[in-house]
């Protein structure tokens, strides 16, 4: 683990290829060897999964979590590879499966739980592209976890820069717009979690709700509405929704 991190965060992480040629990765990271031997016949790519991975590692800052993420972001591509009738390769489901594989690899290499969790979440979501609207971006940040930002943007850019030039400008423009919307959301301090709602479980009980799992369900419903329309996040408006629900239930 120590030697791998030292190599990945060095000025020359591409030296991993030397370790591959010497047969060293076959011992501690055999999954990397499989990536080196997996082609990507696809307009978005111009080299093997392994070569793409090496370029992606070099395209992120020399941070342990970011470089481990780029090392493992496409780890499941060999297992997920399918080829269509035209001879084009596809890798459906590789981010989710890759996240599971990354967890196993990082545990095997005895990384700490915090590093494992952060890397696996970034691997899981590296290909997620929400629609460029305020509500879609708020929902994405809520779903992915605010702590994965802004690292996720570095991951997405490195992935694009390590691909072929096909639609590169368009892909990078998308990430720029996504990041801009995320930053606006943070500047406005928009509510993204239950903790940031203007009401708490205690407020719902005080408004007449019975304690129990329905409190959690109601808070989730309120958050869903606030992600749609941040202007609703005032105590007055949220309690109005709650009391409306209570009177509806009492009527029925």
Task: Describe each model-derived feature in a short phrase.
Residues 32, 140, 199:
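Short clusters of hydrophobic/aromatic residues that line enzyme substrate/ligand-binding pockets
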Residues 7-31, 144-169:
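Structured, non-catalytic alpha/beta "coupling" segments that mediate domain-domain communication
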Residues 40-50, 54-58, 111-168:
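Histidine/acidic-rich helix-loop-helix segments that form or flank divalent-metal centers
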């Amino acid at each position: 683990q120590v030697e791998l991190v030292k190599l990945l965060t060095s000025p020359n992480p591409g030296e991993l290829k030397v370790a591959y040629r010497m047969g060293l990765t076959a011992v501690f990271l055999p999954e990397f060897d499989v990536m080196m031997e997996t082609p990507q016949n696809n307009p978005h790519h111009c080299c093997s999964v392994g070569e793409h991975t090496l370029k992606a590692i070099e395209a992120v800052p020399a941070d342990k979590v970011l470089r481990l993420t780029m090392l493992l972001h496409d780890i499941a591509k060999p297992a997920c590879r399918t080829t269509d009738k035209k001879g084009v390769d596809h890798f459906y489901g590789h981010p989710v499966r890759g996240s599971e594989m990354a967890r196993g690899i990082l545990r095997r290499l005895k990384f700490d739980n915090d590093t494992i969790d952060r890397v696996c979440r970034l691997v899981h979501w590296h290909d997620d592209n929400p629609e460029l609207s305020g509500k879609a971006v708020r929902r994405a940040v809520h779903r992915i976890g605010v702590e994965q930002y802004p690292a996720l943007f570095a991951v997405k850019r490195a992935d694009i820069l390590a691909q072929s030039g096909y639609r590169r400008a368009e892909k990078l423009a998308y990430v720029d717009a996504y990041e801009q919307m995320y930053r606006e959301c943070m500047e406005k301090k928009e509510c993204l979690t239950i903790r940031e709602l203007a009401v708490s479980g205690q407020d719902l009980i005080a408004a007449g709700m019975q304690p129990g799992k329905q409190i959690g369900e109601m808070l989730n419903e309120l958050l869903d509405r606030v992600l749609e329309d941040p202007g609703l996040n005032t105590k007055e408006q949220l309690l109005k929704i709650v009391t409306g629900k209570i009177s509806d239930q009492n009527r029925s």
